Curated annotation (Swiss-Prot):
Lineage of producing organism: Eukaryota, Metazoa, Chordata, Craniata, Vertebrata
Compartment(s): Nucleus; Cytoplasm
Compositional bias per record (Polar residues), positions renumbered to this chain: 302-315
UniProt-recorded name of the protein: PHD finger protein 23
A biological process term (GO) from this entry: negative regulation of autophagosome assembly
Domain-related comment: The PHD-type zinc-finger domain is required for interaction with LRSAM1 and negative regulation of autophagy.
Length: 400
């Protein structure tokens, strides 16, 4: 018996330790408490009407047991002092709501407004006014994202409804439109000014500069471009007028452009340009070309078709004419008339006569660009020197 009594003696200290580690006064939160808490928050925010259970839940008992329970509950969640403060604020909110429900008078809730202006449960009318104010602020601000979160809007939203209805609307209406105008001025003023500046000044300038540079290069390096395989230029008449108009525009431009115009003006003078115009084609029936019935009679009818053939030729055909085209003849050769068709060079491929050294268009000589002979004789040389057909004349190349 003594042994039996002695055995439980070492087991006695654990029961004494259990109440110390786990006090029986501790209360764990349940789902019902959480639901009550959520319903109270929703009722306070004004999303749902307050009920009797919600008003009676926080105010049951005196203030001291509530604080004790709040302290115990805070230990259940977190022992931080912030939880105690939040619970105490909710208790005060519940007390104020209970007083309003008990008194049910619109005049008496005035003191709580002065003491706790932000803890009041707003009515439906005040909620509607707040929503209208928010909508008006969003409509005025538009795409600006920082305006709803600005301190002014937050202060207006946090104010009580009595001061919120007259003041913020007038201030918002007076302060927001100037911002909108400022935005429009910012969008239209600097952006529009730059846009108009780009449209008026910079765009035409580079375009004209590019045209002038192209014309200048075409006049100086037209033959080199033909060697590289660029597209063939159309006949002389369409190409000459643009140079005239561009030269006139260059004279009206700034000093730098006038210098370029002076350089181009010396290359392509105005009186020489009328030569490739309409009166020139009738001159194809020239006394020089009339006697040879073999070549000239066909050349007069085939000038138009030959020009079309020149325009539709391929790039590979132009490479064959490297030796027969005047490459380093200078800019004056553009309007030079040497062929018996009385049309200028105009960048079209030509071939040099091996005897007299005159340059003649391949189209007038009826020579294909793919089949260029080593020795060529013009109609005059063939008529005056028939032995040129037999012997071939001196071995003179087509280089200039």
């Amino acid at each position: 018996m003594l042994e039996a009594m002695a055995e439980p003696s070492p087991e006695d200290p654990p029961p004494t330790l259990k109440p110390e580690t786990q006090p029986p006064e501790k209360r764990r939160r349940t789902i019902e408490d959480f639901n009550k808490f959520c319903s109270f928050v929703l009722a306070y925010a004004g999303y749902i009407p307050p009920s009797k259970e919600e008003s009676d839940w926080p105010a049951s008992g005196s203030s001291s047991p509530l604080r004790g329970e709040s302290a115990a509950d805070s230990d259940g969640w977190d022992s931080a002092p912030s939880d105690l403060r939040t619970i105490q604020t909710f208790v005060k909110k519940a007390k104020s709501s209970k007083r309003r429900a008990a008194q049910a008078g619109p005049t008496q809730p005035g003191p709580p407004r002065s003491t706790f202006p932000r803890l009041q449960a707003p009515d439906s009318a005040t909620l509607l006014e707040k929503m209208k104010l928010k909508d008006s602020l969003f409509d005025i601000d538009g795409p600006k994202m920082a305006s709803p979160l600005s301190p002014t809007s937050l202060t207006h939203a946090s104010r009580p409804p009595a001061a919120l209805t007259p003041v913020p609307l007038s201030q918002g209406d007076l302060s927001q439109p100037p911002r909108k105008k400022d935005r429009k001025n910012r969008k239209l003023g600097p952006g529009g000014a730059t846009g108009f500046g780009v449209l008026r000044r910079p765009r035409p300038a580079p375009g004209d500069g590019e045209k002038r540079s192209r014309i200048k290069k075409s006049k100086k390096r037209k033959l080199k471009k033909a060697e590289r395989g660029d597209r063939l230029p159309p006949p002389g008449p369409p190409r000459a007028p643009p140079s005239d108009t561009d030269s006139e525009e260059e004279e009206e431009e700034e000093e730098e452009e006038e210098e370029m115009a002076a350089m181009v003006g010396g290359e392509a003078p105005a009186p020489v340009l009328p030569t490739p115009e309409a009166p020139r084609p009738p001159a194809t029936v020239h006394p020089e070309g009339a006697p040879p019935t073999d070549g000239e009679s066909k050349e007069v009818g085939s000038t138009e078709t030959s020009q079309d053939g020149d325009a539709s030729s391929s790039e590979g055909e132009m490479r064959v004419m490297d030796e027969d085209i005047m490459v380093e003849s200078g800019d004056d050769s553009w309007d030079l008339i040497t062929c018996y068709c009385r049309k200028p060079f105009a960048g079209r491929p030509m071939i040099e006569c091996s005897l007299c050294g005159t340059w003649i268009h391949l189209s007038c000589a009826k020579i294909k660009k793919t089949n260029v002979p080593d020795f060529f004789y013009c109609q005059k040389c063939k008529e005056l020197r028939p032995e040129a057909r037999r012997l071939g004349g001196p071995p003179k190349s087509g280089e200039p």
